[in-house]
Amino acid sequence: MTREEIIQAIKEMSVLDLNELVKACEEEFGVSAAAAVVAGGAVAGGAAAEEKTEFDVVLASAGDNKIKVIKVVREITGLGLKEAKEIVDGAPKTLKEGVSKDEAEDMKAKLAEVGATAEVK
C-alpha cells in the first residue's frame, strides 16, 4: 500500500473511525497524539469549547491606578517590578497561560478590584 493510498483511505474515514485509528496507533507505537485529538475535536464543532480546561488571563487595560495594578500583576505572575510594569504599560498582554477556570476567574477578580480590565480566554 502506498502513502497516497493510505492518505486516501484516511480521508474517507468518519471522525469516529479516525478517533479509533488514533487510539490504536497510540497503543501500537506507545506514543501520545494529544494535539491530533484536539484538532479532531475542533472539527466536531462546539464540543471542544465546552471541554476547555485551560485558560489564559489577559490584561486588557490597566485603568487609572497603575501602581495597584502593577502590585497585583507581580502577585499573580511572580515577576519583578520592572517586568510587571512593562506588562501593565504594554496592555493588552497575557499574564498567565494554561490555568484552571477557577484560578483564571480569581485573577480576573483581583485585577478588577484595583480598576484593571482583564479577560479570560
From Swiss-Prot:
What family does the entry list?
Answer: Belongs to the bacterial ribosomal protein bL12 family.
Query: What's a GO cellular component annotated to this UniProt protein?
Result: cytosolic large ribosomal subunit
Please state what the protein is called.
Answer: Large ribosomal subunit protein bL12
List, alphabetically, the InterPro entries matched: Ribosomal_bL12, Ribosomal_bL12_C, Ribosomal_bL12_C/ClpS-like, Ribosomal_bL12_oligo, Ribosomal_bL12_oligo_N_sf
Natural source organism: Clostridium beijerinckii (strain ATCC 51743 / NCIMB 8052) (Clostridium acetobutylicum)
Upper classification of the source organism reads:
Bacteria, Bacillati, Bacillota, Clostridia, Eubacteriales
State the protein's purpose. Forms part of the ribosomal stalk which helps the ribosome interact with GTP-bound translation factors. Is thus essential for accurate translation.
GO BP terms, alphabetized: translation
List keywords of the entry alphabetically.
Ribonucleoprotein, Ribosomal protein
Does Ribonucleoprotein appear among the keywords? yes
Listed Gene3D superfamilies: 3.30.1390.10, Single helix bin
List, in alphabetical order, the Gene Ontology terms for molecular function in this entry.
mRNA binding; structural constituent of ribosome
What is known about its subunit structure? Homodimer. Part of the ribosomal stalk of the 50S ribosomal subunit. Forms a multimeric L10(L12)X complex, where L10 forms an elongated spine to which 2 to 4 L12 dimers bind in a sequential fashion. Binds GTP-bound translation factors.
Fetch the NCBIfam families from UniProt: L12
Name of encoding gene: rplL
